[in-house]
Amino acid sequence: MTHGASKTTPETTRAGRQARIVAILSSTSVRSQSELATLLADDGIDVTQATLSRDLEELGAVKLRGADGGVGVYVVPEDGSPVRGVSGGTARLSRLLSELLVSADSSANLAVLRTPPGAADYLASAIDRAALPYVVGTIAGDDTVFVAAREPMTGSELATVLESLNR
């Protein structure tokens, strides 16, 4: 036994590794598990494909195709973004809008956002977490998000604002 060596448990190692995965997926468009493994290795975290696959599953990560229909990127539903109303939520929302917004339309007090199939719930969650003062709430289907504007804003004005956040 070596004295002075720090003792790590599988639990802390897994938690630390998963926290780093969340950080990477929140800031970088990762298109494959091998790309993610390389980014982790760059941070000194060596991981097998089986472990990485298990981590992604435990984190609830999914691979979503972007608005351009190109290669999908991994996203984590609750990716450690700031809690509602805390600065930084709109930066994450802007990134997601740029990746997922296909089109925006409006009716009355609703902005109607189109996404690639399977991405609407994820985008709606990001809008909710951004805690925009002019948004009452969201409803998501498979590829459509209804965003309700807070009066006196109209759906058309809200759609324009959300499109402008799309960097």
Swiss-Prot record:
Keyword Nucleotide-binding found: no
MF-aspect GO terms: arginine binding; DNA binding; DNA-binding transcription factor activity
Swiss-Prot/TrEMBL GO biological process terms: L-arginine biosynthetic process; protein complex oligomerization; regulation of arginine biosynthetic process
Keywords annotated in UniProt: Amino-acid biosynthesis, Arginine biosynthesis, Cytoplasm, DNA-binding, Repressor, Transcription, Transcription regulation
Protein location: Cytoplasm
Any single Gene Ontology cellular-component annotation: cytoplasm
Pfam families xref list: Arg_repressor (PF01316), Arg_repressor_C (PF02863)
Metabolic or biological pathway: Amino-acid biosynthesis; L-arginine biosynthesis [regulation]
Family designation: Belongs to the ArgR family.
Function: Regulates arginine biosynthesis genes.
Protein name: Arginine repressor
Native source organism of the sequence: Mycobacterium leprae (strain TN)
Gene from which this protein is expressed: argR
